[in-house]
UniProtKB/Swiss-Prot annotation:
Native organism: Mus musculus
Lineage: Eukaryota, Metazoa, Chordata, Craniata, Vertebrata
PROSITE patterns, sorted: HOMEOBOX_1, HOMEOBOX_2
Signal peptide, first to last residue: none
Tissue expr: Expressed in phalangeal tendons and in skeletal muscle and in head and body mesenchyme.
Subcellular localization(s) per the UniProt record: Nucleus; Cytoplasm
Keywords tagged on the record: Activator, Apoptosis, Cytoplasm, Developmental protein, DNA-binding, Homeobox, Nucleus, Phosphoprotein, Repressor, Transcription, Transcription regulation, Ubl conjugation
Region annotated Disordered, chain positions: 168-284
GO biological process, one term: negative regulation of apoptotic process
Function: Transcription factor that is involved in the regulation of cell proliferation, apoptosis and embryonic development. Plays an important role in the development of several organs, including kidney, muscle and inner ear. Depending on context, functions as a transcriptional repressor or activator. Lacks an activation domain, and requires interaction with EYA family members for transcription activation. Mediates nuclear translocation of EYA1 and EYA2. Binds the 5'-TCA[AG][AG]TTNC-3' motif present in the MEF3 element in the MYOG promoter and CIDEA enhancer.
Family: Belongs to the SIX/Sine oculis homeobox family.
Name used for this protein in its record: Homeobox protein SIX1
Molecular function GO terms recorded: chromatin binding; DNA-binding transcription activator activity, RNA polymerase II-specific; DNA-binding transcription factor activity; RNA polymerase II cis-regulatory region sequence-specific DNA binding; sequence-specific DNA binding; transcription coactivator binding
Length: 284
């Protein structure tokens, strides 16, 4: 631990002051402290000093200087989350000023796609909604075991994933809501399928029989008229009766011929009467 020339602080002490001022939110004082540091390359390459410079640059809206610091130096993984937030928030602010309105979820996604994180503050692992895939894997595994973690378990999950307790709580809440919505949709589809199947069964014809005629077909079907063959058959029978030697029912052989003729006329009237009536009805 060597004292910096003409300054009175060691490198470790400078790093400690930078961390304390950052955590306390004294960013203006932190900026003045950084400005007072001597021109020492070894000191200015200290990671705590570089991180402090990035925070001050963001606070003052000097985003070009911020991007230069983040892209020019390799930072330790434990500093990545903080520096990634600075990178993304700076690009969000610039995009909002350019568009003249706040960014929504889609707008922020497009900014992230357009300005990906530099490898100096990112380990290359794919992220989803700023959650690393490794963190999401831990949360999914716990969700399969218990969708309702206790406050103590949420704190443990936050430590294991590098997330905050609020982020863990929101992840479980959103996941439960998505699962409930998916279950409701699946249940609705099942009910609709069952209802459609029941309707098809009700409309199916009787097994082994012909499809039933609808009531409209029955109401508007015309009455069947006697065909020509029936009329010819009737006339043939009557002629056969006149030439036959056998007596007709109700008559004896000893009856005179005029009685037989009268009975034939009576039989003709009784048979042709309904037939004629039907033909008249059809013609009207």
């Amino acid at each position: 631990m060597s004292m910096l020339p003409s300054f009175g602080f060691t490198q470790e002490q400078v790093a400690c002051v930078c961390e304390v001022l950052q955590q306390g939110g004294n960013l203006e004082r932190l900026g003045r402290f950084l400005w007072s540091l001597p021109a020492c390359d070894h000191l200015h390459k200290n990671e705590s000093v570089l991180k402090a410079k990035a925070v001050v640059a963001f606070h003052r809206g000097n985003f070009r200087e911020l991007y230069k610091i983040l892209e020019s130096h390799q930072f330790s993984p434990h500093n990545h989350p903080k520096l990634q937030q600075l990178w993304l928030k700076a690009h969000y602010v610039e995009a909002e000023k350019l568009r003249g309105r706040p960014l929504g979820a889609v707008g922020k996604y497009r900014v992230r796609r357009k300005f990906p994180l530099p490898r100096t503050i990112w380990d290359g692992e794919e992220t989803s909604y700023c959650f690393k895939e490794k963190s999401r894997g831990v949360l999914r595994e716990w969700y399969a075991h218990n969708p309702y973690p206790s406050p103590r378990e949420k704190r443990e999950l936050a430590e294991a994933t590098g997330l905050t307790t609020t982020q863990v709580s929101n992840w479980f809440k959103n996941r439960r809501q998505r699962d409930r919505a998916a279950e409701a949709k699946e249940r609705e589809n099942t009910e609709n399928n069952n209802s459609s199947s029941n309707k098809q069964n009700q409309l199916s014809p009787l097994e082994g029989g012909k499809p039933l005629m609808s009531s409209s077909e029955e109401e508007f079907s015309p009455p069947q008229s006697p065909d020509q063959n029936s009329v010819l058959l009737l006339q043939s029978n009557m002629g056969h009766a006149r030439s036959s030697n056998y007596s007709l029912p109700g008559l004896t052989a000893s009856q005179p011929s005029h009685g037989l003729q009268a009975h034939q006329h009576q039989l003709q009237d009784s048979l042709l009467g309904p037939l004629t009536s039907s033909l008249v009805d059809l013609g009207s």
